Amino acid sequence: MDTFKDLAARHDALMAEAPGMRIRDRARKLHVTEGELVARQLGVTARPIACRPVEIYPKLGSLGRILCLTRNEWAVHERYGQFQMVEVNPKVGLVLGTDIDLRLFFSHWTRAWEVNDNGRISLQFFDREGVAIQKIFQTDDTDLAAWQKLVDEFALAPAADPGAQAAGPSSAQAAGAAVAAGAGAPSAAAVSVGAAAQAAGITPEQAAALLAVRDAPVFEPLKPAVTDHGATLDEAARLHLRNRWLAMTDPHQLWPMLQELKLSRITALANVGEDLCQQTDLLAIEKVLQYASEHELPIMVFAGNHAAVQIHGGTVKKLMRAGPWFNILDPNFNLHVNTDAAVSSWVVNRPTDDGPVTSLELYADNGDIIVQFFGLRKPGNPELKAWRALMEGLCAKPLHR
């Protein structure tokens, strides 16, 4: 593990080489997590807050219009609007409304900060490995007084000095680096806290805190990457899977069913039968979004990670390709998908009490979902005929009805 001094030096060198690089990309280059850079205040100013989303999220409606960002390694889902109905318990959260629609799984949430990244201010929540779960950004229409009240209520440290805040992230970074530089000398154990504070331009109390945590592990090590291209089941297992699949009455029954059967999602798709799950070409995402844009077909777009899923419901308009990224760039909704990372694309056909519900789903090399698309529907209603026809048009073989 890097000491603070080592990591700060490598970070400074990277910033000098690529000053405009985003924090997530810097973390990847440095072989650390984004949370590690935030916790060490490298390139950002960060104020720790209590990671108590069960208490925080019901209060987010008071902030007015915000930007809610949820992402995984390959897709970024951004939705502007105001939090409306929020239901939480210690394990899960449900956010519903015309603007913000979320499914939250709190067992993974461990750390939180208010972050100032070059003047862009957000609340950021991380898992135990330092992977970002969700970020809530201020907009021009955010109620700043309500924001400050919320942050102060849950803050674990006093606010930064106004002068330091105005100076930007470099102030906190310089202070930490100055303390670390003093503490990194051969006689580190004998370093005077007062001398370190004077060198850094901070109080002795702040210097003592920095010295105490400068090299302490903040997050657990990242789990090694895996691949999952699906296993081949024997005939009995395939038949059992198919019968269970056909017995579904609600789309949300799929995940617990796979947990019970101890099957990865990609294994289930590959074995349940082509009338229920059918692989498409990787360009299907562009075809579907182009059709939805041109015909004003309302859709649902799901993207997220192990701890949060964010949903857009409505039409999409402005589409743009930028290198490997295919983008939706609408006033209240942005989606960025790295299509080069997709190794498979599937039409997934779920039986329900309201008739079949179909989706287009992109998968990464490790078997994780990159993004999902459905036709817009409410429980109790059948899926849109135009959406069903669009999904059937992607398939070489008929889908089960």
What are these model-derived regions, one by one?
Residues M1-G119, L399:
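An N-terminus-focused feature that recognizes amino-terminal "leader" regions
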Residues V76, G130-K135, V309, G367-V371:
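Short loop/beta submotifs within extracellular cysteine-rich repeat domains
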Residues K59-G61, I100-F105, R111-I121, S293-E294, ...:
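Short, low-complexity cationic-aromatic patches
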Residues G43-W74, G119-I121, L276-V309, P351-P356:
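DNA polymerase processivity clamps
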Residues M1, M15, L94, D101-V179, ...:
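Hydrophobic, ordered structural segments
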Residues M1-T33, E296-Q310, G314-V316, M320-R401:
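C-terminal functional regions that serve as terminal interaction/effector modules
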Residues A16-Q41, A231-T280:
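N-terminal, charged amphipathic alpha-helical interaction modules
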Residues Q253-P324, I328-L329:
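Long, positively charged binding patches that form subdomain-scale interaction surfaces
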